[in-house]
Amino acid sequence: MSNSLQVLITKFHNYIKYEKQYSDHTIKNYLIDLTQFRNNFNTEDITTITTTNLQDYISSLHTMGLDSSTIARKKSSISSLFNFFCKKKIIDKNPCKKL
């Protein structure tokens, strides 16, 4: 299976839409959050993303002046994505666990 972040986000989208049956509104927000997240990294290989990378990303959201509830939602989106990666055995350890 490819570790391309975009390919895996598409698989995650299908998972939350068809298996988890999230609302269209939730799916839309997750995809916006995850697209912004993907655009922040210079890698397409998700196995190289560390807890430190995620902490830096969250810190940058604070620096941008985003509302705390918006940041919490973005963290939730990212955490759900990495939980999916673990569930599907794409990664061994979830870097979100220590956020």
Language model: regions and residue ranges:
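N-terminal core-binding DNA-recognition domain of tyrosine recombinases/integrases
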Residues: 10-25, 31-99
